[in-house]
């Protein structure tokens, strides 16, 4: 069964992507364009040259952070839907440090990043504490905290840190902006995200603490019987996942957007949840999924310019990938589906 489960986790996303592109090609053909040509420009727009590759990595960076946030929390069996709010809180604190505290250069960058991570972790801990000590539903709490964080950001860029008559904050000083990564349009935030993904993978699958955290996520009752501190791991999962999202928000501010403005987070939190589910909560696979979705978004611009196919076709492909993958992975967990494989294995034996 374990081998069948692994095959399903690999097979279903791959087939979902292929079917989604096939449906996208049919839609493009119905619109009167050449599907192969459109998809070729979609690829070129994302990976065709160094500039486009850097843009893809830059667009993937915040998605990687929110995907890793969801992967880590869900591995412990807690549903942190507040990645976007934690992302925003991290950016708010980084913006305050960057514009109001006279620390520049590497110390300034590190201070902003640390403030973002701490802020995101503490913001997530609100939901964790309410779940552990009051029995509240973490999904509802984290969604509510998303709205609060968004409204708080609005107060920041329209009042507290407003720059002139425009509802936005001042740009962060050049001294704390992130340097580029290998001369690409992406910044060093991209390799930082990759390193964090590797660290999460190592922690979850190569340490005893990570094993206990996953055990709590798989069966909290059995973990409690074996003496695991359930509260400790639940709170830790909220704190760490929130810190990851908060760090992502801080680095997005310092490396790409440079100021707080309406639409800063751009739905990164819920995108991360969807990508984590597609990746079956595996941090390394989550990185690949985030880059894939970023490539679709970046490449769709060239596809539209060259062939006239609107970028909404790329959005349709993304939505289909999510629906097919999540539905397929849910289906293989149904008892009837599992029994089918069990009977097949017995017949072969």
Regions found by a protein language model. Give the residues of each.
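Short, non-helical or kinked segments that cap or interrupt transmembrane helices
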Residues: 33-37, 74-91, 132-141, 212, ...
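Helix-loop-helix "hairpin" substructures at the membrane interface of multi-pass membrane proteins
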Residues: 183-259, 283-288
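Short loop segments and helix-boundary regions at transmembrane helix junctions
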Residues: 2-11, 74-82, 103-106, 110-167, ...
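Transmembrane alpha-helical segments in multi-pass inner-membrane proteins
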Residues: 239-319
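Membrane-interfacial amphipathic/re-entrant helices at transmembrane-helix boundaries
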Residues: 1-67, 107
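Single transmembrane alpha-helix segments in multi-pass membrane proteins
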Residues: 27-31, 46-101, 117-136, 277-283, ...
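Transmembrane helix-bundle core of multi-pass membrane transporters
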Residues: 50, 138-206, 313, 340, ...
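Cytosolic-side transmembrane-helix boundaries in multi-pass membrane proteins
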Residues: 1-17, 218, 225-232, 300-349
């Amino acid at each position: 069964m374990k081998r069948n489960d692994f095959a399903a986790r690999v097979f279903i996303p791959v087939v979902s992507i292929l079917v989604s592109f096939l449906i996208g090609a049919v839609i493009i053909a119905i619109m009167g364009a050449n599907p192969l040509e459109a998809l070729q420009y979609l690829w070129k727009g994302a990976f065709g040259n160094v500039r486009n590759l850097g843009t893809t990595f830059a667009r993937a960076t915040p998605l990687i952070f929110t995907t890793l946030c969801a992967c880590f929390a869900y591995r412990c069996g807690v549903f942190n839907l507040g990645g976007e709010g934690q992302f925003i809180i991290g950016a708010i604190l980084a913006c305050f440090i960057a514009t109001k505290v006279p620390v520049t250069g590497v110390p300034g960058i590190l201070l902003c990043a640390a403030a973002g991570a701490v802020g995101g972790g503490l913001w997530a801990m609100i939901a964790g504490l309410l779940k552990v000590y009051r029995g509240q539903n973490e999904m509802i709490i984290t969604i509510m905290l998303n709205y609060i964080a968004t409204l708080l950001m609005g107060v920041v860029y329209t009042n507290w840190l407003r720059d002139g008559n425009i509802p936005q904050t001042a740009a962060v000083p050049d001294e704390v902006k992130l340097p580029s990564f290998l001369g690409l349009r992406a910044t060093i935030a991209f390799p930082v995200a990759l390193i964090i993904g590797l660290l999460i993978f190592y922690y979850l699958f190569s340490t005893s603490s990570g094993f206990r955290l996953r055990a709590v996520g798989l069966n909290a009752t059995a973990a409690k019987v074996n003496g695991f501190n359930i509260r400790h791991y639940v709170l830790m999962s909220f704190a760490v996942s929130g810190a990851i999202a908060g760090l992502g928000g801080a680095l997005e501010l310092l490396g790409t957007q440079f100021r707080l403005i309406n639409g800063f987070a751009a739905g990164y939190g819920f995108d991360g949840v969807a990508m984590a589910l597609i990746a079956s909560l595996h941090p390394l696979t989550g990185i690949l999924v985030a880059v894939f979705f970023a490539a679709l978004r970046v490449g769709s611009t060239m596809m539209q310019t060259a062939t006239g196919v609107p970028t909404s076709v790329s959005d349709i492909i993304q939505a289909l990938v999510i629906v097919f993958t999540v539905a397929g992975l849910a289906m293989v967990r149904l008892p009837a589906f599992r029994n089918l494989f069990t009977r097949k294995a017995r017949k072969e034996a």
